[in-house]
UniProtKB/Swiss-Prot annotation:
GO terms for molecular function: nuclease activity. This is Putative pre-16S rRNA nuclease. GO terms for biological process: rRNA 5'-end processing. Its EC number is 3.1.-.-. Keywords: Cytoplasm, Hydrolase, Nuclease, Ribosome biogenesis. GO terms for cellular component: cytosol. It is found in: Cytoplasm.
Length: 143
């Protein structure tokens, strides 16, 4: 594993067929924060803008797995999107992070944060929060 530049950001994404949730780590890489939810093409533009503004040290991608921990139908779609990221951004380090239960965890966190029930079920808000859950899991695991 390579050393990460201390200035560049670590970004987390939750890839779906209609939306991509994006989260960004703070400069110290202690906390993940939702950045937004975007259409897949728009998310590539957002990632390019983040790269141009702050640099991106690594993109942490939510990796869809079955209950048993094996690849599932959505895994192929996520793999294809990672290739699109590499085409758009050039050389970028990509890490996979198990995304099982991240949407449920995101909804719980939104509830605990006092977000109203309709807001907790807004798919865009949940996708951005799920990206933050994915990224926070990576940050916690890698220290």
């Amino acid at each position: 594993m390579s050393t990460l530049s201390s200035e560049a950001r670590v970004v987390g994404i939750d890839v779906g067929t209609k939306r991509v949730g994006v989260a960004v780590a703070d400069p110290l890489r202690l906390f993940a924060q939702p950045h937004g939810t975007y259409a897949p093409d728009e998310a590539l533009d957002v990632l390019q803008a983040l790269r141009d503004a702050d640099g991106i040290a690594r993109i942490v991608v939510g990796w869809p797995l079955t209950e048993e921990g094996t690849a599932e139908e959505a895994t192929e779609m996520v793999e294809a999107y990672v290739e699109r990221i590499r085409e758009a951004l050039g050389t970028v380090e990509v890490a996979r992070e198990d995304e099982r239960y991240t949407s449920e965890i995101a909804k719980d966190l939104l509830r605990e944060a006092g977000v109203s029930q309709p807001g907790r079920y807004d798919k865009g808000r949940v996708d951005a929060a799920a990206a933050a859950v994915i990224l926070q899991g990576f940050l916690n695991r890698t220290g």
